[in-house]
Amino acid sequence: MASAGAKRQPEAQNGAAVGLAQVAEIPECPGTEECLVPAHETCSTPGEDRCPVGHSLEPELQEEGINLGEEGLNPGVEAGEERGPKPTSSIVRPAHGPKRKAEAELPPGLLLQKEEPEGSHSESSLSSKQHKKAKKRKSVGAPVPPAVASASAPTETLGLEPFAVPWVLAGKAQRLRPLYQYINYCNPELNQAGDGDREPEAEPESELALAPEEAGVEQLQLQTLLPMAGELGLGLALPCPNPLAPLTHNLPPLVEEVGEEPGGLSSLRVSGSLKAEVDKTTQVDIDKMLSVCAAPLVPPLSPQYK
């Protein structure tokens, strides 16, 4: 390294001397002005003035010579620069593995050939993946046609009509609807009011008709017992209204008629007579209520004078 630096110093000095000599030997320009221009720049045309303003090139050339001398003192840097640029294929970073080193040593033609098989391999891997996916889809969708065939075969064996096949292939949601349809179509009496529905409506009317008859019979029994209790009591006689007297006298003949005529006509006569008696008793009750309501109303706090 030291010898290279020593050689560089005299070369720099010789270069500076040659440059000064060239500047001194420049021919005069046609414009009769001295020009300090390097030797390689000569006047091309006699009319043009190549000279710069002032004599400012002398110190610049001197500075260049000094810089060249200083650069000769750095042997390590100059030695690396003089050797020239090295081939890029030999420079390999340590971070890369042996595979990258081998690729750097190989020529570019082989690298391109290697990259092409890698791209084709990646394309083949993608195509194989797509092929596998297609196989999976086919395997998943394959059982569907046998199911249709198995569903259509029993319909043919059972002798069903072809339009019934969609009902067989339908889902659970459509299997529930025909049940209600069959119930409505096969049993139309459920949608109409039959005899069974009409009977309960007729029964309350008959019960309402029988209830007042029973109430009338009970009233008659009480009215018959009241005069007997009044007659047998110790001087306690209850006043009886006049319309009740003939009713008490008419009861024995009714009983005799029932005993004499045990047929269906006797029951009809008894029911007719009971209805007439009930009407009379209800009329008596109405008269009593009207008599009470017709009485003069008296304030509760005022004394009543007769």
UniProtKB/Swiss-Prot annotation:
<feature type="compositionally biased region" description="Low complexity">
    <location>
        <begin position="64"/>
        <end position="73"/>
    </location>
</feature>
<protein>
    <recommendedName>
        <fullName>Uncharacterized protein C16orf86 homolog</fullName>
    </recommendedName>
</protein>
<dbReference type="InterPro" id="IPR031516">
    <property type="entry name" value="DUF4691"/>
</dbReference>
<feature type="region of interest" description="Disordered">
    <location>
        <begin position="40"/>
        <end position="156"/>
    </location>
</feature>
<dbReference type="Pfam" id="PF15762">
    <property type="entry name" value="DUF4691"/>
</dbReference>
<feature type="compositionally biased region" description="Basic residues">
    <location>
        <begin position="129"/>
        <end position="139"/>
    </location>
</feature>
